[in-house]
C-alpha cells in the first residue's frame, strides 16, 4: 500500500512538472513523463518488453488535455501561428499514426535509445547553434515540404512527446521567433497526441502482456493521476516563458533535454 502511495505522489508531481514544462517549452511534457513512468512501471513489475510502450502511450494520452491548456495560454498572448498549423496539421497527424505503429514493433530498449539520441541532438542544436544562421527566412513551400511535418509527427509519436521537441527546433531554423515557435508547438501537441494515442490503444489491445487497468498500451491510472495536474500547471509555464529572453529560453530548453537524454541512455545501456 505504501508503495502505491509513493508512486501516486510521484505521478502527481510529474504531472505538475510536465504541465509547467509544456507551457514553458511547448513540449507537452512527455520528455519528463516517459522516463518517470518507465521507472514506475518497473517498480510495479510490468514486463520489460512493453514497459517503454506503456510509458510512451500513456504520455501521449496525458498530452491531449495538457496541449489544449498550453496552446490556449499561448494563443491569448498571440504566440500561436495558426497559418502554419493549418498547412502542416494533416501531415503531422499522418506521421503520428505511422510513429505509433513503428514504436509498437520495437523493443523497449531500442525505443529508449532512439528517444535519448534524438533528444540529445535537439539539445545540442538549441545550446550551441541557437544564434546560428537559419535555413530560410520563412517557412518553405513546395512539394517536398510535407516531409518535415510528417517527420515531426512520426518522431514525436514514437517518443511519446507532444512535438515541441522537434517543432521548436524546426520552426526556429525557419526564422520563427522562439516564443512563437513554442506556442505553435503546443498546438501541434494535440495534433500528434490524439492519433498517436489511438494508434497505441489499437496496437496494444490484444497484447496479453499489458497490465490490468490499461486500455491497449495506455495506463488509465497513470493518465488519471498525471493529466489533471499537468492541465492545471500548463498556463503557469506559458507565463514564465514570456518572461525570459529568446536566448535564455533556448539555453534552458537545451539543458533540460540533455538531462533527460542522459538519464535514458543510462537506463537503456545499464
What do the predicted segments below correspond to?
Residues 98-102, 154-162, 196-202, 259-270:
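Hydrophobic alpha-helical transmembrane segments in multi-pass integral membrane proteins
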Residues 64-77, 117-140, 238-239, 261-270:
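Transmembrane helix exit motif
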Residues 73-87, 106-113, 134-139, 239-249:
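Interfacial helix-loop-helix linkers and transmembrane-helix boundary segments
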Residues 101-108, 205-217, 268-270:
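Membrane-interface helix termini and inter-helical loops of multi-pass transporters
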Residues 4-20, 24-87, 91-92, 146-153, ...:
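Small-residue-rich hydrophobic segments that form or flank transmembrane alpha-helices
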Amino acid at each position: 500500500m505504501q508503495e502505491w502511495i509513493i508512486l501516486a505522489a510521484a505521478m502527481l508531481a510529474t504531472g505538475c512538472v510536465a504541465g509547467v514544462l509544456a507551457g514553458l517549452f511547448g513540449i507537452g511534457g512527455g520528455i519528463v513523463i516517459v522516463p518517470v513512468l518507465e521507472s514506475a512501471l518497473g517498480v510495479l513489475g510490468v514486463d520489460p518488453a512493453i514497459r517503454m510502450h506503456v510509458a510512451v502511450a500513456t504520455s501521449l494520452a496525458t498530452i491531449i488535455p495538457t496541449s489544449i491548456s498550453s496552446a490556449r495560454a499561448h494563443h491569448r498572448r498571440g504566440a500561436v501561428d495558426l497559418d502554419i498549423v493549418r498547412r502542416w496539421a494533416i501531415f503531422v497527424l499522418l506521421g503520428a499514426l505511422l510513429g505509433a505503429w513503428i514504436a509498437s514493433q520495437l523493443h523497449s530498449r531500442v525505443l529508449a535509445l532512439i528517444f535519448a539520441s534524438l533528444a540529445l541532438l535537439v539539445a545540442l542544436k538549441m545550446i550551441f547553434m541557437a544564434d546560428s544562421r537559419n535555413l530560410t527566412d520563412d517557412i518553405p513551400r513546395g512539394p517536398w515540404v510535407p516531409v518535415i511535418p510528417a517527420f515531426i509527427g512520426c518522431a514525436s509519436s514514437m517518443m511519446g512527446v507532444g512535438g515541441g521537441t522537434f517543432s521548436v527546433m524546426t520552426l526556429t531554423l525557419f526564422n520563427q521567433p522562439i516564443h512563437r515557435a513554442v506556442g505553435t508547438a503546443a498546438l501541434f501537441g494535440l495534433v500528434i497526441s490524439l492519433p498517436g494515442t489511438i494508434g497505441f490503444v489499437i496496437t496494444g489491445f490484444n497484447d496479453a502482456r499489458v497490465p490490468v487497468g490499461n486500455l491497449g498500451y495506455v495506463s488509465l491510472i497513470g493518465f488519471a493521476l498525471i493529466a489533471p495536474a499537468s492541465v492545471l500547471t500548463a498556463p503557469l509555464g506559458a507565463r514564465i516563458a514570456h518572461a525570459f529572453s529568446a536566448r535564455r529560453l533556448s539555453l534552458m530548453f537545451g539543458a533540460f533535454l540533455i538531462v533527460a537524454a542522459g538519464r535514458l541512455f543510462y537506463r537503456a545501456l545499464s
